[in-house]
Amino acid sequence: MTMPATSKPTLIVEGLKTEFTTRGGVARAVDDVSFTVGRGEIMGLVGESGSGKSMTGYSIMGLIDPPGRVVGGRIELTGRDGVTHDLRTLSAGQMRDMRGNRIAMIFQDPMMTLNPVLRVDTQMTEAVLAHQRVSRQQAREMAREALAKVGIPSPEARLQAYPHQFSGGMRQRVAIAIALLNKPDLIIADEPTTALDVTIQGQILAEVQTLCRESGTALIWITHDLSVVAGLADRVCVMYAGRIVEQGSVQQVLETPRHPYTFGLIASAPSRNPRGVPLRQIPGMTPSLLALPSGCAFRERCAFATEVCKQTPLLESLDDGRALRCFHPVTQRPEEATA
């Protein structure tokens, strides 16, 4: 714990590195990742499977199990009270106290949060009592209010239910309510709406956005879906092979992407292609973390790659406020691309 600071971002991640030791070698799942998230800000962390986005979230939460380990970097959390915690220096017990209290996580599968043999009221009141000095009756009232906030009808009656008595969308709402219970400074959401239909997904996204704005809770939303980020987030970081390759405001990154990988993702979206025109695609496959090419990890799939791309590009700030890891920034817009 360090001195109080009132103007700092809620979260500062700097030079984060997470490795997994395997029989085939060492895979760096998170490689020199840096970003900040302000109070009440929603940041999208985007990338395809294996990009390192979920591992970044688990690293912040202190949930990396062997053979994985965080080997470098700084993770600082500054609460509403202005006190800064260096999460990497905390003991296992101290991190346990932080989770569910100052930081919370919403998982893709709500049953990773919910115990199938306990009623919802039992699980929610225990989550409050573990971190706050209140009576059981007060904790239960807080649970009821949290269910109401996430749009669950008849919250008093639903407290009496078991998880299997809820639909998938309602279970995810309960998981979100549990994450919000203790008014955390930071929530990390790992693709929590992926398995839900579009209508339910839209409702939950709107509710989460409103709740974060009202409470001042910072949110990292991990997803592979650019359309979700477009409607939810303020800023976005795009990850590829364990590294952030581009970050900036949602409008900047989605409308005028500068990294060839971001450009390829957006240009290949069906909504940008007229009917009857073949979809664009990014050639090749995502490289194995055990056999990354030298220099830029994207260079073997990139149409703009030259000899200089065999060197490792740094994540550098641009004049427009975004950051980019590329020697050859794209200048055209995605809608100008041809198949």
Pin down the residues of each PLM region.
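Short catalytic/signature loops enriched in Gly
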Residues: 7-9, 84, 153-157, 247-339
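P-loop NTP-binding/switch modules centered on Walker-like glycine-rich loops
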Residues: 43, 48, 184, 188-192, ...
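ABC ATPase NBD coupling module
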Residues: 69, 81-104, 122, 130, ...
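Conserved ABC ATPase "signature" region
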Residues: 76, 138-157, 266-267
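Q-loop/switch helix immediately C-terminal to the Walker
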Residues: 109, 116-129
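Conserved ABC ATPase signature
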Residues: 161-166, 170
